[in-house]
């Protein structure tokens, strides 16, 4: 370990593992350490079930009705992958897909007036849906056609709208969309957590709706994918990539000190030895004095013995509870997966509820979601701080990831990865460039 590295990475969360993989593919000498004996950090999948009981300090062993402990892989952070999103592109370009198997999530649902409705995934479903009335459907369809034809590079598709200036709220007005349709569009399709986006230029929202519909078009049932054996497989896949390119991995390594000289990182001390480095990447838990809290997320892992009611017995789904429906500022999400994904014992379902906490009693805030899941066999409640770095890290060369937010997909995580990459290298993250580098090493195959 007493060596010189270009980059040392602390923590094996998804953000850290992807950056570690990218850096090694770029020819950097990388040492990657984690104080835990397992991969994944905050975004780990916990197995066996007994370990989750211990982690959440639930007394006693899981009851026999839970089946074999080894059959469980429980994600601490619930997220799906958008089928056409940035993370899938990163997986494809780096060929990490060869280590993973994905399943399409069976449906996406939205909560309205105390009931859940399927988010239409085909035109026929849209016409038959009772989410909106007939005239609303026509106006909504016009809006979706506009979005589908919209091209940032072709002003003829703008129809008098300035994508960089016109607020999306104005665009909704132009198409005469009602409040329910606006809620549905912003929260179930563009996947915004709050209504703060309404005053922002419309370009971002249009691109988000495009991402949703392109992701949906790939597989048809829903725009979401989920890896067999749980999300913990993702960081491990990128760790393998890093190892192939000569990255060094050490788990179960207590980190004693990050050594800084004249305001700049020069190394990391572990078990009395010092590894030197030019740059450091880490998650907030390794540098508590360099991050600040900007909020909290509540997540509740619920074990069920039944599919969620009114989901057509889906073995996996997402439910979005728009904030307006429950008088909140942020949406509440439910991600549900099951034994079909090799993450639970036969006949069992895992539903994870999450949202940004807004009061001192976050458990009360998520009651509408828990009511949809009844009866719940066992629940595990976690409230975690949302932490962000206090500075960009360009002076100290210590680059800190943000904690995982309450969104149910990895787009914001990928934004963070690209942002850190730019701060570290001074250049934009380029998927194509990465692909070329891989071909140089492997040759064209």
Curated annotation (Swiss-Prot):
Topological relation to the membrane, as annotated: Peripheral membrane protein
Top-level taxonomic group: Eukaryota
Main subcellular localisation: cytoplasm
GO molecular function: GTPase activator activity; Rab GDP-dissociation inhibitor activity
GO biological process entries: negative regulation of cilium assembly; negative regulation of protein localization to cilium; protein transport; small GTPase-mediated signal transduction; vesicle-mediated transport
Modified residues (N6-succinyllysine): 57
One cellular component term from this protein's GO annotations in UniProt: Golgi apparatus
Classification via InterPro entries: FAD/NAD-bd_sf, GDP_dissociation_inhibitor, RabGDI
Residues found modified as N6-acetyllysine: 112, 269
N-acetylmethionine, modified sites: 1
UniProt key word Mitochondrion: no
Phosphoserine: residues carrying this PTM: 130, 382
Pfam families: GDI
Keywords of this entry: Acetylation, Cytoplasm, Golgi apparatus, GTPase activation, Membrane, Phosphoprotein
Annotated compartments: Cytoplasm; Membrane; Golgi apparatus, trans-Golgi network
Assembly and binders: Interacts with RHOH. Interacts with the GDP-bound inactive forms of RAB3A, RAB3B, RAB3C, RAB5A, RAB5B, RAB5C, RAB8A, RAB8B, RAB10, RAB12, RAB35, and RAB43; binds RAB3D to a lesser extent. Interacts with DZIP1; this interaction negatively regulates the interaction of GDI2 with GDP-bound RAB8A.
Role, per record: GDP-dissociation inhibitor preventing the GDP to GTP exchange of most Rab proteins. By keeping these small GTPases in their inactive GDP-bound form regulates intracellular membrane trafficking. Negatively regulates protein transport to the cilium and ciliogenesis through the inhibition of RAB8A.
Protein family according to the UniProt entry: Belongs to the Rab GDI family.
Protein's recorded name: Rab GDP dissociation inhibitor beta
Gene, per the UniProt record: GDI2
